[in-house]
Amino acid sequence: MPERLKDYYDAVSSPYADKRHCQAVEPLTYLRSLPGTVDRKLLGELAEWPDGPLAESLYACGVSRLGGGSSGGAAEFGELLRTFPESAPARQVAPVLGERIDGRVAEVKGDDPCAAVEALRGLRTTVAALPAQQVPGLSTKAGKGVQDGDYACGVDRFEEGKFSQAKLTLDRFARTYRSDGRAAQARKIAIAAEIAAARPAAGKRLPPSGNPGGPRMELVISNDAPNGVEVLYTGPVTGTVTLKPCGDCKRYSAATGSTRACKVSGKNYPKARLQLPAGDYHFLYKHGTGASSRVDSYAAGSKVRPGYTYTSCTYVIERSLLEPRLPTLPDLLEPTSLSLPRAGSSR
């Protein structure tokens, strides 16, 4: 009978003998449970034999699954640490996880930070599923790696011209890590990325992290539209400003918009005032949906020169499908008129 039992154990545990560790976990777990139903005297040394192979297989399987999913290896490592906490394989869990985290943290500074941060996110989830006392410090290390990686990924996407993805990544970074010293710069890059998605010239370089010295020129933006407007701008400085709806303002025809908008004497148009250093700027006028969900956003570029005060007017053009498209407004502003391009949107 013992010889037949040995043959049985060998047959059931064959995946372990073949080093197919993930496939070996279930049959080894079954063999380990047999002393609960079979006389231990009959089993002899076989009663304790599955412990070592099962611990080894749980470890090897967990390692093979690291990085392969949102919590790769967590189930195997968790079972190992709970069932065989003093085993040699259990003592290897923290070192191997630490080594993997360190490797991905280093990759954040490389050519593909986005791939590195996704791997770090999976490692962080794996660590979070394990007993903290058995993987000390690794949750903090992985979390810091994800934080650095999210920022690096957003910057990388901006520099690669993937502006919509850059905006999403850096908006998330700024919301998640409000106390991070890079949050303000992340918001600036996200603004520039949103503008660049409509006007690629705005994405040729990252926004400056600091504010330039020297004189500032005033830009007064008026809203002659029945819907609110958010104005995004980037250049020597980057930011946003929101204008309230003009309650009694109407849409213009294509023929009258550029000559009549913001021209009613004494009318109190909603206004915003910006103080801008000289330089080239890119603007995105985002019309709200209060008046019509079909109002388009509009992007433009202008140059701010020293010694001038500038104005800009935003308005909405009513356009039928039979009317021709409006021409693109000029990119460069000649300061003789002291006025930025008038930002009209059509619907």
Residue ranges and their predicted role:
Residues 259, 268-270, 274-292:
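A short tyrosine-centered beta-strand micro-motif
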Residues 24, 116, 248-251, 264, ...:
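Disulfide-rich extracellular modules and peptides
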Residues 24, 31, 62, 166, ...:
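Hydrophobic beta-strand residues in large extracellular and virion-surface proteins
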